[in-house]
Amino acid sequence: MDNLKTLVVQKRLDLGKGPNRRLHKKNLIPGIFYTSSGKNIPIQLPELPFTKIFSEVGRTTVFNLKIESDKENITHPVIIWELQYYPVKNRFMHVDLYGVELNKPIKIVVPLEFTGTAKGTKVGGKLETYREQLTLIANPLDIPSKITLDISDLDIGKSIYVADLKLPEGVKTSYDTNYAIVSVIMPGGNTATEQEG
């Protein structure tokens, strides 16, 4: 845990819309820390340090949450679970953080990044994408920030399946191996695999 980034927050004592509005005026974000044992701890996060750490770790990288209070200070590894934004302002309205155990696998959604240009699209094919993110299962420190998929060799009538993914060691996905992620089809044609969900 020593090499993880750390965010220092305080316990939030006053709850509700009124107190939350007052927090925002002080550049603080209301939030909840969900511990791995099932407790919910209301917290308030400093806006600028949280924005900085979010830009560095995103939604999939573990960091340390240090909660300061009059009685005790606790530190726990966490990931960002849910973010709420103001509809107009580019500011966080509420943050949920989820406590993790570093040696226990968790299930988490990770974005897919496609690189290259599918060669089938150069001869009239149409790229059909079924997933832009994947649910992975791994120990928290093994979770990649994204899965990169090179589609350069993808020809018309061909698909890339879950079985074709080169996942990091210790990482697996919750999907069946025959689940198609992306295909190249003829314009107006049917996709190679019937997708569900």
From Swiss-Prot:
One of its GO terms (molecular function) is structural constituent of ribosome. GO terms for biological process: translation. InterPro entries: Rbsml_bL25/Gln-tRNA_synth_N, Ribosomal_bL25/Gln-tRNA_synth, Ribosomal_bL25_b-dom, Ribosomal_bL25_C, Ribosomal_bL25_long, Ribosomal_L25_dom, Ribosomal_uL5_bac-type. GO terms for cellular component: cytosolic large ribosomal subunit. SUPFAM superfamilies: Ribosomal protein L25-like. Signal peptide: none annotated. Keywords: Ribonucleoprotein, Ribosomal protein, RNA-binding, rRNA-binding. It holds the Pfam family Ribosomal_L25p. Belongs to the bacterial ribosomal protein bL25 family. CTC subfamily. Part of the 50S ribosomal subunit; part of the 5S rRNA/L5/L18/L25 subcomplex. Contacts the 5S rRNA. Binds to the 5S rRNA independently of L5 and L18. This is one of the proteins that binds to the 5S RNA in the ribosome where it forms part of the central protuberance. This is Large ribosomal subunit protein bL25. It comes from Lawsonia intracellularis (strain PHE/MN1-00). The lineage of its organism: Bacteria, Pseudomonadati, Thermodesulfobacteriota, Desulfovibrionia, Desulfovibrionales. The gene is rplY.
